[in-house]
């Protein structure tokens, strides 16, 4: 799951 929006998944 994303930690902070979209780029949180990278």
Swiss-Prot record:
Keywords: Amidation, Neuropeptide, Secreted. Expressed in the antennal lobe (at protein level). The keyword Secreted applies. It is found in: Secreted. Disulfide bonds: none annotated. GO terms for biological process: neuropeptide signaling pathway. This is Tachykinin-related peptide 3. It comes from Oncopeltus fasciatus (Large milkweed bug).
